[in-house]
């Protein structure tokens, strides 16, 4: 066969296959695929005759190879014969009886009525769990019969319209009628001891009890109030620490500026009548009490009425380096300054220095050139925020207001005394108040300029120096 001169053929290669060759190759390929999925040895219509060819007993066809038979089985003729044979066999085959269903024999008895019952509602005292106890009387129950029960949904019964809020508990025993109890549709607690039944054969009584599950946890029981005078137990510890003690009802607020705390108010009943003057502690022996410090009127305060003498201005001692007189030492007379520390007084017969000339105190620098010393009898202004006090003398309260109209300030040399305490000064010597220079009788003090005004209590004792040590 000439494969080289065919149309489409190439020199050195095989020629184009004919249609018969293509069909043979296709049938072989299909046979291999069919053998992989179909086992012809199990086909009831496949048969190989004595000539070596294959026959189809259903269609009575002859095939030379297995591929031809497999192709026949997928054809229309073979499939039609299969359907015709199946219909014929189904028609000729005898009808087999259907499998019998299990039938429940219904017991037939004469009903004698409804049994007696008793329902008890119960509630657990500890947990607060609700339960129901049923007692059913079956005095005429049949021999060998035990009462039975079951829960039925509202959708199973046909007596009432279905309501999902309710369910039914059925009780049955021959020859009595079946009775049902309508209970709330809540979940039943089937735990041990929560659901139980009992049949008493002697009294012919049937008992059933069940509990509903708790929907919400019970609230903690409150402690009962004990009799008056009996203290309740302390609360439990929080994180292992005891509770904080209760604070007093009326605690005064802390004073501003670091001042000492005021005394606590009395807890007893308030005394009747007008309030008296504030009680001051008695002074120490040899120490004269200070005169009441009266501040000049600030802005917004009306001046005193005509004929009323203004209070004496508070004049503080010089700046640091000059200490106030020690306790028990009386200040000098008006216009005479005390000697500085470490300077002895002049001996008898020695004249003092001229008026207006003061010896320099230790630690006080001389004035710079061009600075004139103060005139005799004129004291330098106090430094800002310096309020020295003598040891043992309490500072005045920061809430002392100017005197009312018609009240004269104390005369120079007269000091108020604490109630019940009368210190005796030396005869003929009248001590002056600390920081206040007395004025001769009949001479009124001149008002102080605003620049020399003493600091107000609102300025705070931030720059107050400590008191000097006692000698």
From Swiss-Prot:
The modification N-acetylmethionine is found at residue 1. Residues 1-27, 217-471 are annotated as: Disordered. Signal peptide: none annotated. It comes from the Eukaryota. It holds the Pfam family zf-met. Keywords: Acetylation, Metal-binding, mRNA processing, mRNA splicing, Nucleus, Phosphoprotein, Repeat, Spliceosome, Zinc, Zinc-finger. GO terms for biological process: mRNA processing; mRNA splicing, via spliceosome; positive regulation of neuron projection development; spliceosomal complex assembly; U2-type prespliceosome assembly. A zinc finger (Matrin-type) spans 54-84. It is found in: Nucleus. GO terms for molecular function: nucleic acid binding; zinc ion binding. Belongs to the SF3A2 family. This is Splicing factor 3A subunit 2. It comes from Rattus norvegicus.
